[in-house]
């Protein structure tokens, strides 16, 4: 496949311009997995194709459900054709159950506490400072978004979470939490962008944390071995296969 100019490169993907249509771009997934703001990093052969297909399946569901996203198509494994947009340097996290970093920040909250509606949190993308939590006032002061746009992001994020939560529930899996990102299009609209794959959420089959299918398995490893990475790859393949039914 022919790509245009490289526009950006991150820990797990490379963005290329479309060679003919400047309103589009190609998002190419790497075989990398990382944690701890990149402090831990490994390669898993084939992960890029697995993650790319998972994300394409999720975005296809969102598009069909009326959520505006950057996704156009997935022309080959690990590659998504997307609408170009300027990414907001924000991670938007929706939580149904308290776990992970939330419980570390709020030790008074028991793990498994249910949030209804889902709790929405914002984190400023800054690896050097470990993606600090940011609130409405800080988002507006930094000029990242207006108060009205933050409200829209909260509503749209909740909509995306509840749609995916229901879809996973129909397959016997609890969607515990979800991280998404938004981009600003040429006309100023905010759309769901980046990736939504097995690095983006926590999935507990039957609501059982011990059966987790997601990236938390990698974060929890005391020692990274080739066997552990292959077991993790099998979980990612399982999630990809389940999401095929999202289309």
From Swiss-Prot:
Biological processes per GO annotation: 'de novo' IMP biosynthetic process
InterPro entries: SAICAR_synt/ADE2_N (IPR028923), SAICAR_synthetase (IPR050089), SAICAR_synthetase_CS (IPR018236)
Enzyme Commission no: 6.3.2.6
PROSITE patterns from the UniProt entry: SAICAR_SYNTHETASE_2
Pathway terms, separated by semicolons: Purine metabolism; IMP biosynthesis via de novo pathway; 5-amino-1-(5-phospho-D-ribosyl)imidazole-4-carboxamide from 5-amino-1-(5-phospho-D-ribosyl)imidazole-4-carboxylate: step 1/2
GO MF annotation terms: ATP binding; phosphoribosylaminoimidazolesuccinocarboxamide synthase activity
Gene3D superfamilies: ATP-grasp fold, B domain (3.30.470.20), Phosphorylase Kinase, domain 1 (3.30.200.20)
Protein name: Phosphoribosylaminoimidazole-succinocarboxamide synthase
């Amino acid at each position: 496949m022919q790509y245009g100019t490289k526009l950006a490169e991150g820990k797990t993907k490379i963005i290329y311009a479309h060679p003919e249509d400047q309103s589009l771009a190609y998002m190419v997934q790497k075989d990398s997995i990382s944690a701890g703001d990149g402090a831990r990093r490994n390669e898993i052969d084939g992960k890029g194709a697995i993650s790319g297909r998972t994300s394409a399946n999720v975005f296809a569901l969102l598009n069909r459900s009326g959520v505006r996203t950057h996704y156009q198509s997935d022309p080959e494994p690990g590659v998504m054709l997307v609408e170009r947009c300027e990414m907001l340097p924000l991670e938007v996290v929706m939580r149904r159950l308290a776990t992970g970093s939330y419980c570390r920040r709020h030790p008074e909250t028991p793990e498994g506490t249910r949030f209804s509606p889902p709790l929405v949190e914002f984190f400023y993308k800054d690896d050097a400072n470990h993606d600090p939590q940011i609130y409405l006032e800080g988002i507006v002061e930094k000029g990242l978004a207006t108060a009205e746009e933050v409200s829209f992001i909260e509503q749209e994020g909740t909509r995306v979470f509840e749609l995916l939560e229901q879809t996973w529930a129909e397959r016997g899996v609890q969607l515990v939490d979800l991280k998404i990102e938004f981009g600003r299009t040429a006309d100023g609209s905010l759309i769901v962008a980046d990736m939504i794959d097995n690095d983006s959420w926590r999935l507990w089959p039957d609501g059982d944390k011990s059966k987790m299918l997601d990236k938390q398995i990698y974060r929890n490893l005391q020692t990274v071995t080739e066997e552990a990475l292959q077991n993790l790859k099998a979980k990612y393949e399982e999630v990809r296969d389940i999401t095929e039914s999202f289309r």
